[in-house]
């Protein structure tokens, strides 16, 4: 699926109403402040990933109009017209019908690499989890919903831990969610590793990617691992009043041989 035309109305500092895209590689050229990144942000928004920065900063700067519109024509397996309007609320449409961002991501899959993505190697595990979440949301439309459900359960677990409540029922409810998310992330990492292996010239050095289960990794089966790891960390979890096992603590281990990629790659190689 490729974008043939992108139309913008009242979007930041961009005055061009229609931007046409050709097949293959497209380059945006212009002076600093011309709106190159803003143009990419409009695509990022339209394709279901939200703004790159503050949502309140999207409307044209200095304009009295508070509503912003972005639409696009897409071609590939099918023809699709996507539209998003942002103001007091956000409305997303696919071929004229209201839809959700996960639906948009399944219609026109996309992945953006930004300067901040260097934190994929140097940053915290939360940054790498975010990358995995974006990748998995592209592969499985149901992923985002399952992730929201699990995060809600984690918040509930924190409350129960602080209150000294019974965790049995909640642990049972979280088990299939944790198992499913772990399985999805592991499959995504395996697919990414396979793709990188097929393109050896893409990277400066061979890298090995490993999905690391948060607070777990005792047994291979994700469901069994959930229960064994939960049992092993039960007392510590009670003491610190924080959930210690689950996808919310996952990481992506990136290595070059026996060394961390963050420590052995130069800044240029990391890019």
Give the positions of each predicted feature.
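A secondary-structure boundary/capping signal
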Residues: 10, 42, 114-116
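Conserved NTPase motor "head" modules and their coupling/switch loops across ABC/AAA+ ATPases, GTPases
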Residues: 1-31, 63, 168-176, 180-271
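Nucleotide-state sensing region of NTPase/ATPase domains
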Residues: 47-127, 136-143, 191-201, 222-223, ...
């Amino acid at each position: 699926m490729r974008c043939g035309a992108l139309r913008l109305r009242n979007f930041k500092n961009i005055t061009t109403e229609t931007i046409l895209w050709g097949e293959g590689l497209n380059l945006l050229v212009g002076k600093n402040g011309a709106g190159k990144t803003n143009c990419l942000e409009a695509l990022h928004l339209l394709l279901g990933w939200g703004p790159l920065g503050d949502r309140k900063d999207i409307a044209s700067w200095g304009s009295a109009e508070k509503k912003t519109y972005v639409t696009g024509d897409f071609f590939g397996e099918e023809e699709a017209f996507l539209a998003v309007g942002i103001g007091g609320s956000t409305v997303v449409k696919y071929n004229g019908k209201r839809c959700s961002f996960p639906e948009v991501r399944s219609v026109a899959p996309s992945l953006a690499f930004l300067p901040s993505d260097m934190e994929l190697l140097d940053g915290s595990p939360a940054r790498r989890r975010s990358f995995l979440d974006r990748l998995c949301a592209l592969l499985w439309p149901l992923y985002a919903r399952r992730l929201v459900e699990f995060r809600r359960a984690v918040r509930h677990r924190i409350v129960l831990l602080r209150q000294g409540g019974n965790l049995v029922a909640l642990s049972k409810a979280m088990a299939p969610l944790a198992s499913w998310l772990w399985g999805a992330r592991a499959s995504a990492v395996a697919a990414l590793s396979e793709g990188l292996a097929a393109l050896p010239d893409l990277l400066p050095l061979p890298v090995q990617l490993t999905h690391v289960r948060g607070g777990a990794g005792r047994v291979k089966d994700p469901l069994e691992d959930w229960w064994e790891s939960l049992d092993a960390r039960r007392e510590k979890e009670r003491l610190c009043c924080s959930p210690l096992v689950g996808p919310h603590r996952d990481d992506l281990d990136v290595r070059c041989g026996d060394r961390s990629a963050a420590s052995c790659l130069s800044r240029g190689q990391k890019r």
